[in-house]
Every structure is written in C-alpha cells, then in structure tokens.
C-alpha cells in the first residue's frame, strides 16, 4: 500500500498529464465538442485505479458526446500515462463527469434569490396581519 503522500503526488501528476493530453494529443472529435477540464483525480491506495473527474461546458448533447469520446480514449490515456510516468503498474483509468460546478452555481442562484423571497413573504405577512384598533 502506498503512502498518502505518494498517492497525492501520483494523483497530481496524472491530473497534469491528462490535462496536457486533452489539449494536445487526444484527436477524437467528440472530445472537442465541449470545453473539457480535469477537476480532480482520485487514485486508489494501491495505485491500481484512477478516477479522473472532468468538468464539461456545453449543451447536454455535447456533454454526452464528450464523455463517450473520453471513455473510448481511456486505453490511449492509460498507455500514454504508462510511458510518461515511472510506475511499476499503470493505473486503470476511468473518466467521470464532475457536476460540482453546476451544483455550486445552482446553490449560488438560490442564495441570491433568497433575500427577494424573504422580502416578498414579509410584505405578504404585513398585509394579512390583523389591525388592532
């Protein structure tokens, strides 16, 4: 079992190398339909599996097409990682879509609209209140 420092270093190295591959070496047209960025890489403790989280900007169709292209490019990415990194065994690579940015944007929109909703409720409560005379 690798130490957590080694796992962290391998993870950051994979992130850097895969980002470079996305920019320059993956020739699949489907990968280019949406703007893709690597947000995080999780490597298992035994360095045998790597989950690569990608954020894709574009329409839902472009996202689906890009993910299909990334899944088909996974063997190429693994082979390239094996040639570039000095590891005993190259980890199995899987691409997963990272939706945290979308969720964060949705939460920010809800929080920004919250003061307006509270102000509207306060006005409705003031209008429906009983007058004491």
Curated annotation (Swiss-Prot):
Keywords per UniProt: Cytoplasm, Ribosome biogenesis
Any one biological process term the GO annotation gives: maturation of SSU-rRNA
Main location: cytoplasm
Gene Ontology cellular-component annotations: cytosol
GO-annotated molecular function: ribosomal small subunit binding
Subcellular location per the Swiss-Prot or TrEMBL entry: Cytoplasm
Gene3D superfamilies: 3.30.300.20
Quaternary structure note: Monomer. Binds 30S ribosomal subunits, but not 50S ribosomal subunits or 70S ribosomes.
PANTHER family attached to this UniProt entry: RIBOSOME-BINDING FACTOR A, CHLOROPLASTIC-RELATED (PTHR33515:SF1)
Family statement: Belongs to the RbfA family.
Main function: One of several proteins that assist in the late maturation steps of the functional core of the 30S ribosomal subunit. Associates with free 30S ribosomal subunits (but not with 30S subunits that are part of 70S ribosomes or polysomes). Required for efficient processing of 16S rRNA. May interact with the 5'-terminal helix region of 16S rRNA.
Protein name listed in UniProt: Ribosome-binding factor A
Organism encoding this protein: Synechocystis sp. (strain ATCC 27184 / PCC 6803 / Kazusa)
Gene: rbfA
């Amino acid at each position: 079992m690798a130490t957590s420092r080694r796992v962290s270093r391998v993870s950051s190295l994979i992130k850097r190398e895969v980002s470079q591959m996305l920019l320059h070496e993956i020739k699949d047209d489907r990968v280019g339909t949406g703007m893709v960025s690597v947000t995080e890489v999780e490597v298992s403790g035994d360095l045998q599996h790597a989950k690569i989280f990608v954020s894709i900007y574009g329409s839902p169709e472009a996202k689906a097409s890009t993910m299909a292209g990334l899944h088909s490019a996974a063997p190429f990415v693994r082979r390239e990682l094996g040639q570039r990194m000095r590891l005993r065994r190259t980890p199995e690579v899987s691409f997963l879509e990272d939706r945290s940015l979308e969720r964060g944007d949705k939460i920010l929109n809800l929080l920004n609209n919250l003061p307006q909703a509270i102000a509207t409720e306060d006005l409705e409560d003031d209008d429906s209140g009983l007058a004491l005379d």
